[in-house]
C-alpha cells in the first residue's frame, strides 16, 4: 500500500511538470527589453539586442532592416523632447512597460510589451500619449530577429511633415 501511495505521489509530481507553453515576466529576455527601453530613453540605444538580420515591422507588412530601424529610433529623438514610457494608470505607474516572454516549445521565444509612449513634438509643440504594443521573436543566438510594433503613427507622421516643411 505504501508503494502504491509513493507511486501515485511520484506520478502526480511528474504529471505536474510543465512541458507546454510557459509564460514568464522576470526572465532574462524580459529584463533585456527593459534595459533596452532605458537605453532608448537615455538615447544610448545601440541595437545590441537586435540581430543584424532583423526584420522590423512598424505597423506594416513590409519589414525594414537593422540599419533602417536604428535610424528610426534616432528620428524619434530628433522629432520629440521629453520622451517617456510607462505602464499603469495615474499614480499607479510602476514600470516602464509590462513585458512577458512566452516559450513556445515548437516555435521559440516570443516577448510582448505594452506601454504608453509620451513625447512633445519639437515642431508642433504638442504633447502626445500613444498606447503601444510590441512583439519580439528571439533567435537561437539570443538576439531579436523579428519585431512587430503596433501603435497609432498619425502624430509621428504629422511631426515628420512639419520637420520637412521647416527644412524648406
Label every model-predicted segment.
Residues 1-4:
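Positively charged n-region of N-terminal signal peptides that target proteins for export
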Residues 7-8:
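Short, intrinsically disordered, low-complexity terminal segments
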Residues 12-15:
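C-terminal motif of bacterial Sec signal peptides marking the signal peptidase cleavage site
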Residues 17-168:
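C-terminal and inter-domain tail/linker signature
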